[in-house]
């Protein structure tokens, strides 16, 4: 426990409208923890194809080396296109509110509907807009991540990340899917 970290996490949580939050050592660590606490070898995730390059590499390469597959879809994919990307072993959907550096905007509501229709959580990286400009939980996200190094820090002097849980996803309702 670190009271300073706890205070910052609580502030970010309140700004996002979440139920709980934690800080990480970086934004990449936040995305890593959010994904790897849900998916494991043999699992699959669906992700927006337009995301920060480091996160794309995490999902497309590092996760694949660890036995987790991914299907990428456009950030404005239709519900039908999203549904086609799911597999029986899909564990999560990932996207970025506003992609860095492409500035493509994620259709959070459609991604949330697809994720929830398939019984999996939607994870949204909200680094670019921060909760000052967009609160993904209000649009259906279950988990929100941040690189606090970017806009929250102001100019990259401090490295950090955050994970916010909306507190609404019913993990127990999915049976053995999320032990």
Predicted regions and their residues:
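Aromatic- and Gly/Pro-rich amphipathic surface segment
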Residues: 1-16
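Conserved PLP-enzyme active-site core in the AAT-like
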Residues: 21-179
């Amino acid at each position: 426990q670190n009271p300073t970290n706890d205070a910052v996490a609580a502030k970010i949580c309140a700004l996002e409208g979440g139920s709980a939050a934690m800080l990480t050592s970086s934004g990449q660590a936040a995305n890593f923890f959010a994904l790897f606490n849900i998916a494991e070898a043999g699992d699959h995730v669906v992700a927006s194809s337009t995301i920060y390059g480091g996160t794309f590499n995490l999902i497309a390469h590092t996760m694949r080396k660890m036995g987790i597959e991914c299907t990428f879809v456009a950030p404005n994919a239709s519900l039908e296109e999203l549904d086609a990307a799911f597999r029986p072993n899909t564990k999560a959907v990932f996207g970025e509110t506003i992609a860095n550096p492409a500035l493509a905007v994620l259709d959070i509501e459609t991604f949330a509907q697809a994720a929830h229709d398939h019984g999996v959580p939607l994870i949204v990286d909200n680094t670019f807009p921060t909760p000052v400009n967009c609160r993904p939980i209000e649009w259906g996200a279950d988990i929100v991540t941040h690189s606090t190094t970017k806009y929250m820090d102001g100019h990259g002097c401090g490295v950090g990340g955050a994970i916010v849980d909306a507190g609404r996803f019913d993990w127990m309702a999915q049976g053995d899917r999320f032990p």
